[in-house]
């Protein structure tokens, strides 16, 4: 199969993965309207083509916090990445290091902080939810610091898990889910051998380390559901801000007022995000939400954005809308599932080449030159 885009990697991943895993990463909340709009609204942003601009060499690098990145891209935190390829978090982290960008380890990863650190050293980021078990939160923050993590991504848009209809149909949840997953693995022998058997242990590495017992995938949904805390407020995060001495990013901002409060709270950055359309269906796409947020907090903190990004062109669009850098999640998981570490590296090369073409044809030499003037019109998003 010829692979030339994220969409090709998606097709390859769909063939290779058992349905319960493919649809878990591919699906969204409820009727998936927001998930679809995330992509559609980005495509509605027309780039402003310019000619004879003497562009020459294009510089894709940026400085993000204290890191120099080769691309304005960060691999987003994705739970259970280690189920999409054998020791998937390690492979994705190695690919990110090879391409000079950060990898963000999810707190509900298969591979633990210690395992990832042993493979790639320091420099990766870590993601954490607000959970009822404050002991776990403190413990994992201490372990992440010892592993060399200096950037914490705090997910704030998940006080309760979103309802994802696809999961019940695919076997991730619903009646006879365990039996259905076993049957799916039988008819996907490559995944069953390479990941299902050779990729063990399949536990939540960071949680198991804290509880000192194996937390299997069967326990995954129950453990998360029991620990999400819908009663949290800004004051509940203050101890974390005081405790954590590194950079702190709040992920899941969609409203300008919340962005202002993030500045007042002392966040170093935000991720404008609707969780890839996986939490509350019917909310604004990131492409729609981003400009108003950028208008009120640009210069006060670093702005990242995710949701709907499938190409280097989409990265340029997000930056033109006000982002300093972009996170990608589904896209790199498709590549990881299809071709492992090399797949993620190839995907990032595709993104880089697409960015170079887009920047050259819009007349900009460096990422910092991408502005709202790089867009021809946003009328389609403002109707």
UniProtKB/Swiss-Prot annotation:
Pfam families: FMN_dh. Residues 1-380 form the FMN hydroxy acid dehydrogenase domain. Its cofactor is FMN. InterPro entries: Aldolase_TIM, Alpha-hydoxy_acid_DH_FMN, FMN-dep_DH, FMN_HAD, FMN_hydac_DH_AS, LldD. It catalyses: (S)-lactate + A = pyruvate + AH2. GO terms for molecular function: FMN binding; L-lactate dehydrogenase activity. The keyword Membrane applies. Catalyzes the conversion of L-lactate to pyruvate. Is coupled to the respiratory chain. Belongs to the FMN-dependent alpha-hydroxy acid dehydrogenase family. This is L-lactate dehydrogenase. It comes from Bartonella quintana (strain Toulouse) (Rochalimaea quintana). The lineage of its organism: Bacteria, Pseudomonadati, Pseudomonadota, Alphaproteobacteria, Hyphomicrobiales. The gene is lldD.
């Amino acid at each position: 199969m010829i692979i030339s885009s994220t969409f090709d990697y998606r097709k390859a991943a769909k063939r290779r993965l058992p349905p319960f895993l493919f649809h878990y990463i591919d699906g969204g909340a409820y009727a998936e309207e927001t998930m679809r709009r995330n992509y559609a609204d980005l495509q509605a942003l027309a780039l402003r083509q310019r000619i004879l601009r003497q562009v020459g060499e294009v510089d894709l690098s940026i400085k993000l916090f204290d890191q120099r990145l080769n691309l304005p891209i960060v691999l987003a935190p994705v739970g259970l990445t280690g189920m999409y390829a054998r020791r998937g978090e390690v492979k994705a982290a190695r690919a990110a290091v090879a391409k000079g960008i950060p990898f963000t380890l999810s707190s509900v990863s298969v591979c633990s902080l210690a395992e990832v650190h042993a493979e790639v050293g320091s420099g990766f980021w870590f993601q954490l939810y607000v959970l009822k078990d404050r002991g776990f939160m403190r413990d994992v923050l201490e372990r992440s610091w010892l592993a060399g993590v200096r950037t914490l991504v705090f997910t704030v848009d998940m006080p309760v898990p979103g309802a994802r209809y696809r999961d019940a149909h695919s076997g991730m949840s619903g009646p006879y889910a365990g039996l259905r997953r076993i049957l799916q693995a039988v008819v996907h022998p490559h995944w069953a051998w390479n990941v299902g058997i050779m990729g063990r242990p399949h536990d939540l590495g960071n949680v198991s380390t804290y509880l000192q017992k194996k937390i299997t995938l069967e326990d995954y949904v129950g453990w998360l559901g029991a620990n999400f805390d819908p009663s949290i407020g800004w004051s509940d995060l203050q101890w974390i801000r005081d405790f954590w001495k590194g950079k702190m990013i709040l992920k899941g901002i969609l409203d300008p007022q919340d962005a202002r409060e993030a500045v007042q709270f002392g966040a170093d950055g935000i991720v404008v995000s609707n969780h890839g359309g996986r939490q509350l269906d019917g909310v604004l796409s990131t492409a729609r939400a981003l400009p108003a947020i950028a208008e009120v907090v640009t210069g006060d903190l670093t702005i990242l954005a995710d949701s709907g990004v499938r190409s280097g062109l989409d990265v340029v669009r997000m930056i033109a809308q006000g982002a300093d850098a972009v996170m990608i999640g589904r896209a790199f998981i498709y590549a990881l599932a299809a071709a492992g570490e090399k797949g993620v590296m190839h995907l990032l090369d595709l993104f880089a080449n697409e960015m170079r073409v887009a920047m050259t044809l819009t007349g900009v030499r460096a990422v910092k030159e991408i502005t709202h003037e790089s867009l021809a019109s946003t009328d389609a998003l403002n109707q």
